[in-house]
Amino acid sequence: MSGQRKGYIAKVSGPVVIAKGISDIKMGEVVYVGNEGLLGEVVRVSQDSFAVQVYEDTSGLRPKEPVTATGKLLVAELGPGLMGRVFDGVQRPLKSIEELVGPFVKRGVKVNPLPRNVKWHFKPSVKVGDKVSSGDIIGVVQETPLIEHRVMVPIGVSGKVKEVVPEGDYTVEDPVVILESDGRVVELTMKQEWPVRQPRPYKERLPSEVPLLIGQRIIDTFFPIAKGGAGAIPGGFGTGKTVTLHKVSMYSDSQIVVYIGCGERGNEIAEMLKEFPVLVDPKSGRPIIERSIIIANTSNMPVSAREASIYMGVTIAEYYRDQGYDVTLIADSTSRWAEALREIAGRLGELPVERGYPAYLPDKIAEFYERGGRVKALGSPERSGSVTVLGAVSPPGGDYNEPVTIHTLRFVGTMWALDTDLAYRRHFPAINWLKSFSQYADIIERWWVKNVSPEFPKYRRRALRLLTVASEIEAIASVVGEGALPDDQRLILLTSEIIKEGFLRQTALSGEDVFCKPEKQYWLLKMMMDFFDKSYELIRKRVSIEEILRMPEIYEMMRVKEDERGLQAVKELYERVMAKLDEIAQRHGVTLAVEAEEVVA
């Protein structure tokens, strides 16, 4: 069929090709363009012509070269062999391309996404006579030491099991189960295909109630994201977006990470590929690459493939979600994707709106973030999975009032606002605690109450309030000087400095502080807020703040996070700090009992 449906190029405009000669072409259909057969997708159909978005470099294409229709939509190939591999934006494995044509991706190169020659050990979980339908698990494959791949009945297929292969080694193309469906025989292999622009169906959407723990204190404690939630990380150049997202992919407690490098620098992807095979997953002791899939679409790759990479990544994430896994999908950066949309829209002559972006930009952004969520999957056995979507946004000049940032914030539940001033002060992660927000915080507090401490919500709220009050006092102190402030305000500034240095600031490179467990986060915050409460009561009882400032434990509170003894060191320091404050109180003959709720309620 594909040999018969041929047209020809009428016009080439950058990544957009106008073609003619195929009367029954459909929107979204995949076509091969030119003598080299460049992959493209139909994005507009007119009465006598159609526009193709080409996913490869169009240099050298000429009018009258052939355009061949395939009759298929742009699909992701799903099955064993995805995990631990690196793909380009249209799911071509880069390692296979290197073996085939060398270090540079040549135009028109065609490689199967899943290896056809690798045999996987398949264990069937159905027997002859069983009735199966969409989403039912028919067998399992140990894809990597960390991930068990659950082979599912493709969506839209059902029937009675007629034949099952015995446990053994098979390729992704070998039939493993044969069904009888409405008098037809259907062969099921370990691979299936799914159109990337169409969300995969599920049985039921579930509430997002469990936190995605990342080990970064400012995120887990103050601005958490739920499994199945959506988050944005806007920030200017050099504020640490990519490093923050790398930490999420390395240390988050999701079972699978899909990382989309969309239009970012090639060196950053190269750095990831160097780190991931070496870095060890703290929970399993295995390399992190064994639970990761990387889609590399760097800034020097074709612009139009950026859009395909976003949809390809989210489709793969949904596939593993349907198997019952918690997946984190990271898109770095969605701004580059939006720029690609802008360029394609301009080439097609669509009406530009704000800053040249097309009018449908908000719909595209919403479509992407709404594919996240925690769901009950189709089929049996019953299982639930989640896709947590995290997108970096790179506003030009750090301006949050540009369209991509504004529209993104409408559709996400968490924003980690990266601040240029904090980054220049070497305060990392440079997340601004006054601009960031999390709509999941109240729901996730229940998890902290149940698993860590019932007092956690109180400490969290009061610490955030103290930081807000401190920022107002800092503005006054910059005019009159800190020495001119009353003692209670000086104490607020001191505690705020302890929280910033000892809690919010965190190394991303090595040592004890690279990942902080929930219990340690709670005890650090408890120590700092209890220090504030007791010190505030001393000041109210006319004890000078100079007495408190002389405590050597103040500097220890800022450094204990790096102590290799971990939680034990924090608890020991807490006892010493409380004992020291009690000693000061005893010396001045005052009683300590009251929390400083009225100052930072």
Swiss-Prot record:
It is an enzyme of class 7 (translocase). Pfam families: ATP-synt_ab (PF00006), ATP-synt_ab_N (PF02874), ATP-synt_ab_Xtn (PF16886), ATP-synt_VA_C (PF22919). It is found in: Cell membrane. Disulfide bonds: none annotated. It catalyses: ATP + H2O + 4 H(+)(in) = ADP + phosphate + 5 H(+)(out). Its main location: membrane. SUPFAM superfamilies: C-terminal domain of alpha and beta subunits of F1 ATP synthase, N-terminal domain of alpha and beta subunits of F1 ATP synthase, P-loop containing nucleoside triphosphate hydrolases. One of its GO terms (cellular component) is plasma membrane. The keyword Hydrolase does not apply. InterPro entries: ATP-synt_VA_C, ATP-synth_a_Xtn, ATP_synth_asu-like_sf, ATPase_a/bsu_AS, ATPase_F1/V1/A1_a/bsu_N, ATPase_F1/V1/A1_a/bsu_N_sf, ATPase_F1/V1/A1_a/bsu_nucl-bd, ATPase_F1/V1_b/a_C. It is a peripheral membrane protein. Its EC number is 7.1.2.2. One of its GO terms (biological process) is proton motive force-driven plasma membrane ATP synthesis. GO terms for molecular function: ATP binding; proton-transporting ATP synthase activity, rotational mechanism; proton-transporting ATPase activity, rotational mechanism. Keywords: ATP synthesis, ATP-binding, Cell membrane, Hydrogen ion transport, Ion transport, Membrane, Nucleotide-binding, Translocase, Transport. ATP binds at residues 235-242. Belongs to the ATPase alpha/beta chains family. HAMAP family: ATP_synth_A_arch. Component of the A-type ATP synthase that produces ATP from ADP in the presence of a proton gradient across the membrane. The A chain is the catalytic subunit. Has multiple subunits with at least A(3), B(3), C, D, E, F, H, I and proteolipid K(x). This is A-type ATP synthase subunit A.
